Amino acid sequence: QYTPIQHERMEAMIQYSDNRATNYFIELLNRTSRRSGPAEVEHTLKRGNPGVFRHTRIVEYIPRGGRTYRNRASALDYHRFLQALWYDQLPYSEELKRLLHLPNRDRVYTGAREIPRGTWVFDKTGTTARLCGDMGILVARGRDGRRYPYTFIGIIEKARPTRNYALWKNIRGDVIREVSNLTYNHLREMYDLV
């Protein structure tokens, strides 16, 4: 059952990248399994969606300060997840879309000047001292009045933790925005987008 507290924490996890909220849900799964919480998260994802989460590894809770480097997911897994979500092939797809559509400081639309207003965005950002990323579905408008959904996954990694987290996050976020602009311009030509 999806309680009001769980609803609130789910929004905090998705909209604000609240690591305590994330750990709450990992711990919730931990209570229902003989596996550890992280192992149960991975097992649950793969059991329910074996074709989607092929290269995802969940091995740890998110430590204090968010310095987790051992949990992994591939860009292709993110794409498969977003595609399955868009076509309502996941449990609770409508709620997941609602959560990913909540306003946030995304890196695929906000500040990406080439992408017109009115483009729908369903996304999740992620940042550590070694990774800056955003994955999402953008739904562009065509000149024919139709909507054109596409996935965008931007991930920038570095081998060692940055010493200046804010600068790292801001500069890499701007790089992702620029690639999002380039992607939109390419699709604009292909599909006669607004």
In which residue ranges do the predicted regions lie?
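Structured C-terminal helix/loop/strand segments within mature extracytoplasmic catalytic/sensor domains
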Residues: 85-109, 113-120, 125-194
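Active-site SXXK
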Residues: 1, 13, 152
